[in-house]
Amino acid sequence: MTFRHCVAVDLGASSGRVMLARYDSKHRTLTLREIHRFVNCLQKTDGFDTWDIDSLEKDIRLGLKKVCNEGILIDSIGIDTWGVDYVLLDKQGQRVGLPVSYRDNRTTGIMPQALVQIGKSEIYRRSGIQFLPFNTIYQLRALTKQQPELTAQVAHALLMPDYFSYRLTGEMNWEYTNATTTQLVNINTDDWDDTLLAWTGAKKSWFGRPSHPGNVIGDWICPQGNRIPVVAVASHDTASAVIASPLANKHSAYLSSGTWSLMGFESKMPYTTDEALAANITNEGGAEGRYRVLKNIMGLWLLQRVLKERRITDLPALIAQTEALPACRFLINPNDDRFINPDDMRAEIQAACRETDQPVPVSDAELARCIFDSLALLYADILHELANLRGEKFTQLHIVGGGCQNSLLNQLCADACGIRVMAGPVEASTLGNIGIQLMTLDELNNVDDFRQVVSANYDLTTYIPNPDSEIARHVAQFQPKRQTKELCA
């Protein structure tokens, strides 16, 4: 068979897509086509910020049916989503309540309890995962303490991509890359950690052993009656994005830029030293036994909220106005937990500037300038931190995901980091999803083989650092004095 058709379901925190990939194995060409796009947003349910999971499932099925109705024979399906959130099921496999979003405030004050009762170094020694107040470990603790009546009904807990795979196939699976984001997987055994899980109050029987990417979970029966394999891809969207990052060598770092920015490097070994703990470095699971050694950055969430609040629809025009403004007049720490989900992002940014005796951004362009400059400076700090951790400098940074379309931010990043930036591909999560499917179908050998396909089929844009730019001069003057505040650590 010369052609393969694979479908990637890629769910983000603000939107979802069903994408069709066509791979020509003879010429090693890979094309993507968007079949269906839909909105994903939070809703208030009984006082909690929850996901409209039934609407998401409806749109996933609609997208799959659209492909089938075109007469295309699908070879496989894969699903990737964000991490940490989960869906509860009873003994009959029916949903118990609605999944609560990681942005809900129910976990407030929970993480400090764990640090006292288990110990920060002990949690890190076991999991190797960064401390974020919304990690699944703290969500489950909040669930069992705050909603015992719900807990009593639970027989299974599935992470988001595993839930949708279950709904398509009837088979349960706990995919490894997403499971590691929970802070509940033991970094030495790749299985759930008994001590950490016991602290949450959740039962170990709710979970099956995590499985690495590349296994077939089960089949979805399409409207025409064909049985289509559903593959457990690297179901954490960042894990998929990293798979599609055309990293040239060990001196390349990556930045997955979207609602969240995740900056890191690939490693065959985890970094769980005291230095890594102090820097709140995470060691999330990747494909082929690789670790994604990285740090979370609040990312373009701040901009997305400002755009929504200000009802801005012309982003290119805003970026053009922003580019005309001087750099580094308004600076915030994007990783301050005050920006996780404020009632008014614009007001929160202004308050942060006011509290640090800076000018206050008023116009939309000034707010955007504040966000872009602040992100670029944080990128520079974290890249320096990662280089120190591994004892080697990076020579290149690959920016992938939707945020890599922002040419202003890309150049600011290159200037602040003092490093060459390669931007693209945009559809990194979708491509990485497809890559694992093609490996499972025996069309590709491994991740490195797939990256060669990505490099050959997708154009990258190069940004050369300008040492004379305003932000580069700012870094040269102030970076030795700057300290990176950890996101909610």
UniProtKB/Swiss-Prot annotation:
Pathway: Carbohydrate degradation; L-rhamnose degradation; glycerone phosphate from L-rhamnose: step 2/3
Keywords: ATP-binding, Disulfide bond, Kinase, Magnesium, Nucleotide-binding, Rhamnose metabolism, Transferase
Pfam families reported for this sequence: FGGY_C (PF02782), FGGY_N (PF00370)
Binding residues for ATP: 13-17, 259, 304, 402
GO terms assigned for molecular function: ATP binding; glycerol kinase activity; rhamnulokinase activity
InterPro entries to which the protein is assigned, alphabetical: ATPase_NBD (IPR043129), FGGY_C (IPR018485), FGGY_N (IPR018484), Rhamnulokinase (IPR013449)
UniProt catalytic activity: L-rhamnulose + ATP = L-rhamnulose 1-phosphate + ADP + H(+)
Ranges in coiled-coil conformation: none
Lineage: Bacteria, Pseudomonadati, Pseudomonadota, Gammaproteobacteria, Enterobacterales
Descriptive protein name: Rhamnulokinase
Cofactor(s) in the UniProt record: Mg(2+)
Similarity field: Belongs to the rhamnulokinase family.
EC numbers: 2.7.1.5
Function: Involved in the catabolism of L-rhamnose (6-deoxy-L-mannose). Catalyzes the transfer of the gamma-phosphate group from ATP to the 1-hydroxyl group of L-rhamnulose to yield L-rhamnulose 1-phosphate.
Biological processes per GO annotation: glycerol metabolic process; rhamnose catabolic process
Catalytic residues (UniProt): 237 (proton acceptor)
Residues reported to bind substrate: 83, 236-238, 296
SS bond list: 68-222, 353-370, 413-417
GO CC, one annotated term: cytosol
SUPFAM superfamilies per UniProt: Actin-like ATPase domain
Superkingdom of the source species: Bacteria
